[in-house]
Swiss-Prot record:
This is GMP synthase [glutamine-hydrolyzing]. Homodimer. Catalyzes the synthesis of GMP from XMP. The keyword Nucleotide-binding applies. Keywords: ATP-binding, Glutamine amidotransferase, GMP biosynthesis, Ligase, Nucleotide-binding, Purine biosynthesis. ATP binds at S232, G233, G234, V235, D236, S237, S238. Residues 205-403 form the GMPS ATP-PPase domain. One of its GO terms (molecular function) is GMP synthase activity. Residues 13-204 form the Glutamine amidotransferase type-1 domain. The gene is guaA. Coiled coil: none annotated.
Length: 528
C-alpha cells in the first residue's frame, strides 16, 4: 500500500476550533471521556478541510481576546451555514453572535469570574436534564448585548443576561460559561447533550478500538524495517514498547541509556521487566561515568539540563550507529506535545504537526535534526490518561502504569548544586524510603508525586551525643490531576515522622528532614 493509505486514520467526530483558550485541550479530553473522538485544530481551518473531515459537530473554544480587537482571531463565517451543529464557548459564543449580526459589549462592572448559578429560561436540547440554579464556572469580561435573528436566550445569571443561547433550527448553540471545567456542576451533561443528542455522535472511541486500529497501521507503515525506541521506563515509552512489540515483534529494538540519575533499583527492574519477563529486546547502555564527569563543577540547573541533553544525544548517536541501521525511530509523543510544540502549525485535516520535528526526549534535550529516521508516533493523538488505559489493556502492570512522573534528567535536578556519586547515593536511599513508606501507607496512588530533594548546604545536628554537620533532605509530596497545578499533600503526621526517622537513621550524611508545603503556583513541583 502507499504511504498515504497508512496515514489515513479515524476522522474526529467533533472538531474543536482553538481561539487561544487555556481550556482547549480540556474540552477535547472531556469529549473523549464520552467515548467520542475529538481533535483540536486551528481556528483558521478552511471550509474545504472541514467538509473533507465531515465532523458531526464543531466546538468554538474560548479565548483571551475581545471580538472587537483589531487582530482578534476569527473563523470562516461560512462555517455557520454548513448545517453542522456548533457550540460556542465563551469567546466562541461571542464570535458567533457578532458574525451572525448580533452585538457584544465590553466588560464594565458586570464581568464575571468564578462560580455562578444559572437560571434556566426555557427548555433546550443543550440544557436537557440540567438543574435550574446549578453552578457553572464563569470567566469572561465581554457579554452579549443583542442576539442575532433566530436565536433565543435559554439561560441567564445574575450578571449575565445571555448565559446560554440557541438557534434550534440551525443547531447553533452558545454558553458564556465553561462546561468543560470541573467546577461546572452539570458541565459534562451539557457536553453529552451536544455530543450525543444534538450532534448524534456514536460512542465508539475506546481503548480497544484504538488498539485494533493502530496495530495494523503500524505494520503497514513499517513493513519489514527495523524500529528503534529510546526506553525510559515511564508510562509513555513503556506503553509504546508493548504496542510496538505486539505489532512488529523482533523488528523492534529498545535502547535504555542509564545515565546514572535514576531511582534506586530502577535500571535493574526495567531490564528484568522488559528483557527477561516479556522478552522485549532491550539494549542496556551504561553511560553513568560519562554523564557524571560532564557535570563536574556544574551548579546551575539549566546548565545541568543542557549538558545532560547534549550528552544523551551523543550517546544515542553512537549507539544507534552501532546497533543499526534503523529506518524508523519510535517516540512516545502525546497529543499535548503535538499541540504545544506546533502552536498554530497544525494540519487542519488531521490535527498533526505540519513540520514534524523530533521532540525533546523526556525533557533532556532534542535529538539531532539530521538523524535519518522516519518517525513512528502511534500515541500522538492520545492524552496521558488514555495512554495509561492503553498500557493496561496491553498488559502493563500497575507498577508501570501508575508510576509517579519522573523528570528526564532524573535525580540530577533533585540534587541542588553540583552532582556527584556521594550525593546520588544519599538521595537514592532517601528517595526510596519516601516512596516505600508512602506505598506501605496505601497513599501512593492518591498522590501525584512523592520524592526527596537534597539541598546543597549542611546543617548542625546531634546524633549519639556528638555534633554532626550533614545534608538536609526535603520531602516533596503533591496532589494534582495533570501536573499543571498542584497542592501539597496532607500526609498524616505519623507517616511523616516515620519517613523522617528512617532517613536520618538509615541514610549516611543526613541529619535533618523538612517538608515542603508550597503549592503550584507559586512554586513548581520540582525544585530545579
Amino acid at each position: 500500500m502507499s504511504q498515504k493509505s497508512f496515514k489515513k486514520e479515524r476522522d474526529p467526530s467533533i472538531l474543536i476550533l482553538d481561539f487561544g483558550s487555556q481550556y482547549s485541550e480540556l474540552i477535547a479530553r472531556r469529549i473523549r471521556e464520552t467515548n467520542v473522538f475529538s481533535l483540536v485544530v486551528s481556528n483558521c481551518i478552511s471550509i474545504e478541510d472541514i467538509n473533507d473531515i465531515n465532523p458531526k459537530g464543531i466546538i468554538l473554544s474560548g479565548g483571551p481576546n475581545s471580538v472587537y480587537e483589531q487582530n482578534a482571531p476569527k473563523c470562516d463565517k461560512k462555517i455557520f451555514n454548513l448545517g453542522i451543529p456548533i457550540l460556542g464557548i465563551c469567546y466562541g459564543m461571542q464570535l458567533m453572535v457578532k458574525e451572525l449580526g448580533g452585538s457584544v459589549i465590553s466588560a464594565t462592572k458586570k464581568a464575571e469570574y468564578g462560580r455562578a448559578p444559572i437560571n434556566i429560561d426555557q427548555e433546550s436540547d443543550l440544557l436537557r436534564d440540567v438543574e435550574d440554579k446549578s453552578i457553572m464556572w464563569m470567566s469572561h469580561g465581554d457579554s452579549i448585548n443583542c442576539l442575532p435573528d433566530g436565536f433565543n436566550k435559554i439561560a441567564h445569571t445574575e450578571n449575565t443576561l445571555h448565559a446560554a443561547i440557541s438557534n434550534d433550527i440551525k443547531k447553533l448553540f452558545g454558553v458564556q460559561f465553561h462546561p468543560e471545567v470541573v467546577h461546572s456542576e452539570f458541565g459534562m451533561k451539557i457536553i453529552k447533550n451536544f455530543v450525543y443528542n444534538i450532534s448524534c455522535c456514536e460512542a465508539d472511541w475506546t481503548t480497544e478500538t484504538y488498539i485494533e486500529e493502530t496495530i495494523p497501521r503500524i505494520r503497514e507503515q513499517v513493513g519489514n524495517k527495523k524500529v528503534l525506541l529510546a526506553l525510559s521506563g515511564g508510562v509513555d515509552s513503556s506503553t509504546l514498547a508493548f504496542l510496538l512489540n505486539k505489532a512488529i515483534g523482533n523488528q523492534l529494538t529498545c535502547m535504555f541509556i542509564d545515565q546514572g540519575f535514576m531511582r534506586k533499583g530502577e535500571p535493574e527492574f526495567l531490564m528484568n521487566f522488559f528483557d527477561k519477563k516479556f522478552h522485549i529486546k532491550v539494549e542496556y547502555i551504561n553511560a553513568r561515568e560519562r554523564f557524571i564527569a560532564k557535570l563536574k563543577g556544574i551548579t546551575d540547573p539549566e546548565q545541568k539540563r543542557k549538558i545532560i541533553g547534549e550528552e544523551f544525544i551523543r550517546v544515542f548517536e553512537e549507539e544507534s550507529n552501532r546497533l543499526g541501521p534503523f529506518q524508523y525511530l519510535a517516540q512516545g509523543t502525546l497529543y499535548p506535545d503535538v499541540i504545544e510544540s506546533a502552536g498554530t502549525n497544525i494540519d487542519p485535516k488531521t490535527g498533526e504537526r505540519i513540520a514534524v520535528k523530533i521532540k525533546s526526549h523526556h525533557n533532556v534535550g532534542g535529538l539531532p535534526k539530521d538523524l535519518q529516521f522516519k518517525l513512528v508516533e502511534p500515541l500522538r493523538k492520545l492524552f496521558k490518561d488514555e495512554v495509561r488505559k492503553v498500557g493496561g489493556a496491553l498488559g502493563l502492570p500497575d507498577e508501570i502504569i501508575k508510576r509517579h512522573p519522573f523528570p528526564g534528567p532524573g535525580l540530577a535536578i533533585r540534587i541542588l548544586g553540583e552532582v556527584n556519586n556521594e550525593k546520588l547515593d544519599c538521595l537514592r536511599d532517601a528517595d526510596w524510603i519516601v516512596r516505600d513508606e508512602i506505598k506501605k501507607a496505601g497513599l501512593y496512588n492518591d498522590i501525584w508525586q512523592a520524592f526527596a530533594v537534597l539541598l546543597p548546604v549542611k546543617t548542625v545536628g546531634v546524633m549519639g551525643d556528638k555534633r554532626t554537620y550533614a545534608w538536609p533532605i526535603v520531602l516533596r509530596c503533591v496532589s494534582s490531576e495533570d501536573g499543571m497545578t498542584a497542592d501539597w499533600s496532607k500526609i498524616p503526621f505519623k507517616i511523616l515522622e516515620r519517613i523522617a526517622n528512617r532517613i536520618v537513621n538509615e541514610v549516611i550524611s543526613v541529619n535533618r528532614v523538612v517538608y515542603d508545603i508550597t503549592s503550584k503556583p507559586p512554586g513548581t513541583i520540582e525544585w530545579e
